[in-house]
């Protein structure tokens, strides 16, 4: 065999690639949505997938196979006899014969099919108990191809045992993926977790539950009973459509339905369940199903041959079944069972829509599968907040978010969220990576904004590094690293302080010596430079004086300009005889030869050097140089003095650098106490406050006439609450736009029932009995006969969101004031005030993006936020408008499908309908332009039938606040406050440091008065790091204070003004463990009590507390530092021995 040519190799490689591509196209996904908490008795999980079409010749050999690890029920895998009922044009028709009802004929034959959805009795009912899974398929066929739909039903426990597996049907591969949603036990509808509870509509008022539209998949089950008509399902349909006199429909069975993605089986019909009655009525209206065709056939055409009859089974002597013969895109299921037989007769009718009209008596069938929709009441699962934490990993951070009830929404502007999920019980976890830690990590999770302070991560990495460096002394490694790893100038000050304390006796003389050497060299260079400059100036002056008195200084022979008279005289003597005046070596007595010799002569500076030596020699030992040279930097007194001064200065810098910057929102470290304001004039505050921020203002109001009389004043403004009176408009629906052409050769357009006529929203235009040959295909001759029916309808309706219209809006804040012993609270509305005899607090106005008549759309839970629509149609809606398709309690509201039909014709071809109106739903349009709509976030929502309340977490709204306190206060009455407050520290958790934060639990006792509004702070001996406003009642009160800051020696106490608890607690040290994010909304607190800033005494107190904390902490750290100090002093003594005394040095 010869070598393959490059062309053959290329073709072979291309063939392999095409084979791989073909194999990839044969892979289909079947998604099984599971709640992430599986409990016993939760029924079945169901899913389906529509496969590509296959030739009708392959149907009889189809077999559904599985490689999944679950146990498949074998009942549906066996062969079952079907009557194959087909149609064709009669072969004896003459050419150009006009089509009529007698132009077509049908054929019946018996075939065996396996794997179709023929579910025996009790199979579904016992599937959960027996841990059996049911896999089957159904067929939608025309004359040439069939489109299979594969169904998978299994116990919900398979969500735990199976993640992914493969099914196969013919040459198609089906990837079954079990996906756990963020729902605990409910189903994902409209982006929210919905638990359908049908009994709620019977026992509770309508405003206490929600109503959702859910898909229903039903499967026909045959069950024969020996007597009675209880199982004759067709009797129920006939009763429903009020058809009497039908006695021949004796088929016995029922439908078993599954609602949504998982549910308990629903039996249809069932007298004691209104859900069953609803499904039954929908089956009667749409006997072939409410899902009309597959997505890719949304715009297609069909040719109707007409009504046909046939025999089922094929051995019958007369016709027992009828239907509508067609060609073109397949629509509904092509499998059914005959209603007139006691024993089930299964029919497979490719290219025929079998009769399903229950208002007639004969030749009817029931489909083996039925798909539709049903509206059910239920409850929405409550959501919980996320917990987000991060750990440092390489150049970025590894983060994880988890929630007890699932994560319905998570995003981040700084991280890559890959949706890798884990579930532990009811808890959902998502891991993601943040590539940058040079800025704080922001994560939006379950409607909450979480912020992870990345400097805390860097602190952890610093601790890890220093712990590794000091690993030889593990007992002190971590403690020492914790002290050193403090961010900012404070951390550098700590490091310098420890270096000075431990190694100051070595570093001080060493650094001083280096500085002195540099200064001495600089002084010498400056002095040397000045000497040379003066010498050159002197030579120039001598030269100029000689030129003035004696003439030119240029040698006449060599033309060299001399600088002194002796040099010129030597030139005159030597150059004329050809000798060098400098080295006296012989040369030619020419200018060029002598100048060339001067360039290499090494003694040309001989006369300058003689002149320099004749002058006084410079001795650079005076002034600065001498002082620097004689400085005794090794003196013990000098080193000890500098060491003490540096320690004091560094302690001050260390304490001062611990202060944080002033912020508009958040806590600012201050000293103890509160500010004092002399009431010489009225106290007025006028400011703008973000909607998500609370505000605390506390002062001591002082009598200007008597400084001893002071009244405590406390003002508390809570976060803004938005109150909207709403009108529930219903649920916005998305739909697939379908355009169908139905052409048939003869008869009027009303003669047949077209598929869109059972759709909820449709329009139809008929082109009937048109004259002209241009619109007739060759196999349908004739002029002025037949019909082309054009239909537009909306299919695959899907609920996408809740819609509320704002009727009115209010913005409120709760305002509380405490003036002396007087306390007043009121919820203040816009343009409203809280007024007392001395204080007036007004909410003047609000800057808002909401307006009455706006429409709010929620595409998920309320906590996920929503979109604001300024234009929302409520009465006359066109398809494509916001609010075009709405599901309301009164029923479905269909939009106007504005546009006109046009029949496109060509000679000898089937006509095609065209529609020039909009074909994109309003929801799809909104998604394409989602960024153009205003969005808003929601925190702490509360909803009722006609009201919606929430807090804006983004501070996108602002309130204008005005506060006036009159100067005419009754100081004699209000300054005498009988309230006595005692404080005790109960517990603390968290860590000191500005990044991590701590939670201090205080026990506050109030006596001598019934209630008192004040603020309790978390402080150490020097400063305060957090506060909370508390409305104390008589007796014991437990107060939680969240603070950030402090140091390793801080003993956090509970303080009120200048009074603190007797004992304090030490928080944990920051470490390398995961850093948990905090709610941005919780930190939006503005606290202003006018307390003085930390001054000099506060700095020393803070430094002293830190030193005591170090001493009282890990004593080994202090021991190691002292040992290092002693070693450095010994090293200093060895390197810088004491100088002998002057007397001993000059002893005679």
Swiss-Prot record:
Signal peptide segment: 1-23
Region (Binding to the ribonucleoprotein): 526-543, 598-615, 602-613, 621-635, 1131-1143, 1131-1148
Residues carrying a glycan: 142, 357, 409, 937
GO biological-process terms attached to the record: fusion of virus membrane with host endosome membrane; signal transduction; symbiont entry into host cell; symbiont-mediated suppression of host innate immune response; symbiont-mediated suppression of host TRAF-mediated signal transduction; virion attachment to host cell
Record region (Fusion loop): 767-787
Site feature (Cleavage) residues: 658-659
Gene Ontology cellular component terms for the protein in this record: host cell endoplasmic reticulum membrane; host cell Golgi membrane; host cell mitochondrion; host cell surface; membrane; virion membrane
Name this protein carries in UniProt: Envelopment polyprotein
Organism field: Puumala virus (strain P360)
């Amino acid at each position: 065999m010869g070598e393959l040519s490059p062309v053959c190799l290329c073709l072979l490689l291309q063939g392999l690639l095409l084979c791989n591509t073909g194999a990839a196209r044969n892979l289909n996904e079947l998604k099984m949505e599971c709640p992430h908490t599986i409990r016993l008795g939760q029924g079945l999980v169901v899913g389906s997938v529509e496969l590509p079409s296959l030739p009708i010749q392959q149907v009889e050999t189809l077999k559904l196979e599985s490689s999944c690890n679950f146990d498949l029920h074998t009942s549906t895998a066996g062969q079952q006899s079907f009557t194959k009922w087909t149609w064709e044009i009669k072969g004896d028709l003459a050419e150009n014969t006009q089509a009529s009802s007698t132009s077509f004929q049908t054929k019946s034959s018996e075939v065996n099919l396996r794997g179709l959805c023929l579910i025996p009795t009790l199979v579904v009912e016992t599937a959960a108990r027996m841990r059996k899974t049911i896999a089957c398929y159904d067929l939608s066929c025309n004359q040439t191809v069939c489109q299979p739909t594969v169904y998978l039903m299994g116990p919900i426990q398979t969500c735990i045992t199976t993640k992914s597996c493969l099914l196969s049907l013919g040459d198609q591969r089906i990837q079954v993926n079990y996906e756990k949603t963020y729902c605990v036990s409910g189903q994902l509808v409209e982006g929210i977790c919905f638990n359908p509870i049908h009994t709620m509509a019977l026992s509770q008022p309508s405003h206490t539950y929600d109503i959702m539209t859910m898909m229903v998949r039903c499967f026909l089950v045959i069950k024969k009973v020996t007597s009675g008509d209880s199982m004759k399902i067709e009797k129920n349909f006939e009763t429903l459509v009020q058809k009497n006199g039908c006695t021949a429909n004796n088929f016995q069975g029922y439908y078993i339905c599954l609602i949504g993605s998982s549910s308990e089986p629903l039996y249809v019909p069932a007298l004691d369940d209104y859900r069953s009655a609803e499904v039954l009525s929908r089956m009667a209206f749409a006997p072939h199903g409410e899902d009309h065709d597959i997505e890719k056939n949304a715009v297609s055409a069909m040719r109707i041959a007409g009504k046909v009859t046939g025999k089922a089974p094929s051995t019958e002597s007369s016709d027992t079944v009828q239907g509508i013969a067609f060609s073109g895109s397949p629509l509904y299921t092509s499998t059914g069972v005959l209603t007139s037989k006691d024993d089930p007769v299964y029919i497979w009718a490719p290219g025929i829509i079998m009769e399903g009209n229950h208002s007639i008596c004969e030749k009817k069938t029931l489909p083996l599968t039925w798909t539709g929709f049903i509206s059910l009441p239920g409850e929405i699962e409550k959501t919980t907040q996320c917990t987000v934490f991060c750990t440092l990993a390489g150049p970025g951070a590894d983060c994880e978010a988890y929630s007890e009830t699932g994560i319905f929404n998570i995003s981040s502007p700084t991280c890559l969220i890959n949706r890798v999920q884990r579930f532990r019980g009811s808890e959902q976890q998502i891991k993601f990576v943040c590539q940058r830690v040079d800025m704080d990590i922001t994560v939006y999770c379950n409607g909450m904004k979480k912020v992870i302070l990345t400097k805390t991560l860097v602190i952890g990495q610093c601790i890890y590094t220093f712990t590794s460096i000091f690993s030889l002394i593990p007992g002190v490694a971590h403690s020492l690293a914790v002290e050193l790893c403090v961010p900012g100038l404070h951390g550098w000050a700590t490091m310098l302080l420890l270096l000075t304390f431990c190694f100051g006796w070595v570093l001080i003389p060493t650094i001083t010596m280096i500085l002195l050497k540099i200064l001495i060299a600089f002084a010498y260079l400056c002095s040397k430079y000045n000497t040379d400059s003066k010498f050159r100036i002197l030579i120039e002056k001598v030269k100029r004086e000689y030129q003035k008195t004696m003439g030119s200084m240029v040698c006449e022979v060599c033309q060299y300009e001399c600088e002194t008279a002796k040099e010129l005289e030597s030139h005159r003597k030597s150059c004329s005889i050809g000798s060098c005046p400098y080295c006296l070596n012989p040369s030619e007595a020419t200018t060029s030869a002598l100048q060339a010799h001067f360039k290499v002569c090494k003694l040309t500076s001989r006369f300058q050097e003689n002149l320099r030596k004749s002058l006084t020699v410079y001795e650079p030992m005076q002034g600065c140089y001498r002082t620097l040279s004689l400085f005794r930097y090794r003196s013990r007194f000098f080193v000890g003095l500098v060491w003490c001064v540096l320690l004091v200065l560094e302690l001050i810098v260390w304490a001062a650098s611990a202060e944080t910057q002033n912020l508009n929102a958040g806590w600012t470290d201050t000293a103890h106490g509160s500010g004092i304001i002399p009431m010489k004039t009225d106290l007025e505050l006028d400011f703008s406050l973000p909607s998500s921020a609370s505000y605390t203002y506390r002062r001591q109001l002082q009598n200007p006439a008597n400084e001893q009389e002071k009244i405590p004043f406390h003002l508390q403004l809570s976060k803004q609450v938005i109150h909207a009176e709403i009108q529930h408009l219903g649920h916005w629906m998305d739909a697939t736009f379908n355009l169908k052409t139905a052409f048939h050769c003869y008869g009027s357009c009303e003669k047949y029932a077209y598929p869109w006529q059972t759709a909820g929203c449709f329009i139809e235009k008929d082109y009937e009995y048109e004259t002209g040959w241009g619109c007739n295909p060759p196999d349908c001759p004739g002029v002025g006969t037949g019909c082309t029916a054009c239909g537009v309808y909306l299919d695959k309706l899907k609920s996408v969101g809740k819609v509320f219209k704002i009727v009115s809006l209010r913005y409120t804040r709760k305002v509380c004031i405490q003036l002396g012993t007087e306390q007043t609270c009121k919820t203040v509305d816009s343009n409203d005030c809280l007024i007392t005899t001395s204080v007036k607090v007004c909410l003047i106005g609000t800057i808002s993006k909401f307006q009455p008549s706006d429409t709010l759309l929620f595409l998920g839970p309320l906590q996920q936020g929503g979109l604001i629509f300024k234009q929302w149609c409520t009465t006359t809606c066109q398809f494509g408008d916001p609010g075009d398709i709405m599901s309301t309690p009164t029923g479905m509201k269909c939009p106007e499908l504005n546009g006109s039909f046009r029949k496109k014709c060509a000679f000898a071809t089937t006509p095609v309908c065209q529609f020039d109106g909009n074909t994109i739903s309003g929801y799809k349009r909104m998604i394409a332009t989602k960024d153009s709509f205003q969005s808003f976030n929601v925190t702490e929502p509360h909803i009722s039938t006609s009201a919606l309340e929430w807090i804006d977490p983004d501070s996108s709204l602002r309130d204008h606040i005005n506060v006036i306190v009159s100067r005419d206060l009754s100081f004699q009455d209000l300054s005498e406050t009988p309230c006595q407050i005692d404080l005790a520290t109960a517990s603390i958790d968290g860590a000191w440091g500005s990044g991590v934060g701590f939670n201090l639990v205080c026990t506050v006792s109030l006596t001598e008065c019934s209630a008192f509004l004040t603020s309790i702070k978390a402080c150490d001996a020097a400063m305060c790091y957090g506060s909370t406003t508390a409305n104390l009642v008589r007796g014991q009160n437990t107060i939680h204070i969240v603070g950030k800051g402090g140091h390793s020696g801080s003993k956090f106490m509970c303080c009120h003004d200048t009074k603190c608890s007797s004992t304090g607690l030490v928080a944990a040290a920051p470490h390398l463990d995961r850093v948990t994010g905090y709610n941005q909304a919780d930190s939006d607190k503005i606290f202003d009590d006018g307390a003085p800033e930390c001054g000099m005494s506060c700095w020393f107190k803070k430094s002293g507390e830190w030193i005591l904390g170090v001493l009282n902490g890990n004593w080994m750290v202090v021991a190691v530092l002292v040992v290092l100090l002693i070693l450095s002093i010994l090293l200093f003594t060895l390197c810088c021995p004491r100088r002998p005394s002057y007397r001993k040095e000059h002893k005679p």
